[in-house]
């Protein structure tokens, strides 16, 4: 594990990997350690508006929360399924055939981050790729200062109660149910007296809502991939993401209209101006 300050990311790496399929970080190619096991998963739908200049455009995707005995893990469901397929192909000696089938186009995702909760104990670990490096940072699980409110409602078949917190530059409204005694939820959110069924920021730029709870007949591993992570802080990580975006835009402007790939990068990054945290 390396520790270093985060520098501005060269544009070259982004131009080489401009595709929105962030699954280019192939986690199944790396050694990993098993942290826990789960036989219960919770799928959430996320709807988000990534462009503040076009709030009518709403994107959506499925995310998965794997609930272990001690550790839980949250990530893109497409990313999870694609990584598992790749690892199975690698174990069977069929990795090249797997690449040749180009399965990745069926498992597109905007989210390559992964979040481990209660790893290390009492903290969560957020890890992601900001080209060209892999970064991780940790924060205390108790980072959320929830305000429990009296308002109640129902979502689907679940009676829910309202809660509020401030995090990542946004005001968040959560609806949780004590009928599912799991103090967890989507993204980094946890710590309420029951499962979070729905949570959104007050502008509804990011909305997570429960899709399905599944229990399996067998247990699956919760893994942490050893990718030579650069350990940093949340603040420095967010700064790296912002610097990455600004670097793309400034260099694309300097490149002129003849640099097609840079102009494509410029247009793409202009539309991704509304991160979940800032």
Question: What label would you give each PLM region?
Answer:
Residues 1-32, 276-278:
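Bacterial Sec-dependent N-terminal signal peptides
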Residues 28, 33-278:
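Extended soluble regions of mature proteins
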């Amino acid at each position: 594990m390396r520790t270093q300050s985060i520098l501005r990311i060269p544009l070259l790496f982004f131009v080489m990997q401009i595709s929105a399929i962030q699954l280019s970080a192939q986690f199944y190619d790396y050694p990993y350690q098993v942290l826990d096991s789960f036989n219960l998963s919770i799928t959430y739908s996320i709807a988000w508006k990534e462009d503040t200049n076009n709030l009518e455009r709403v994107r959506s995707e499925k995310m998965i929360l794997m609930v272990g005995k001690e550790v839980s893990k949250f990530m893109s469901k497409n990313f999870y399924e694609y990584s598992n397929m790749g690892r199975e192909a690698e174990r069977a000696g069929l990795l090249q055939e797997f690449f040749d089938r180009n399965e990745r186009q069926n498992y597109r995702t905007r989210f390559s981050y992964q979040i481990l909760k209660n790893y290390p104990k009492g903290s969560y670990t957020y890890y992601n790729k900001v080209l060209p490096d892999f970064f991780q940072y940790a924060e205390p699980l108790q980072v959320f200062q929830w305000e429990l409110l009296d308002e109640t409602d129902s979502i689907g078949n679940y009676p829910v109660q309202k809660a509020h917190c401030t995090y990542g530059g946004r005001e968040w409204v959560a609806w949780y149910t004590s009928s599912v005694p799991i103090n967890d939820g989507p993204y980094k959110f946890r710590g309420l007296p029951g499962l979070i069924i729905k949570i959104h920021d007050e502008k509804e730029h990011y909305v997570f809502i429960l899709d399905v709870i599944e229990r399996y007949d067998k247990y699956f591993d919760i893994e942490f991939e050893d990718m030579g992570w650069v350990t940093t802080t949340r603040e420095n990580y967010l700064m790296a993401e912002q610097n990455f975006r600004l670097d793309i835009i400034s260099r694309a402007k300097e490149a002129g209209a003849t640099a097609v790939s840079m102009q494509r990068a410029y247009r793409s990054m202009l539309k991704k101006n509304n991160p979940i945290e800032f």
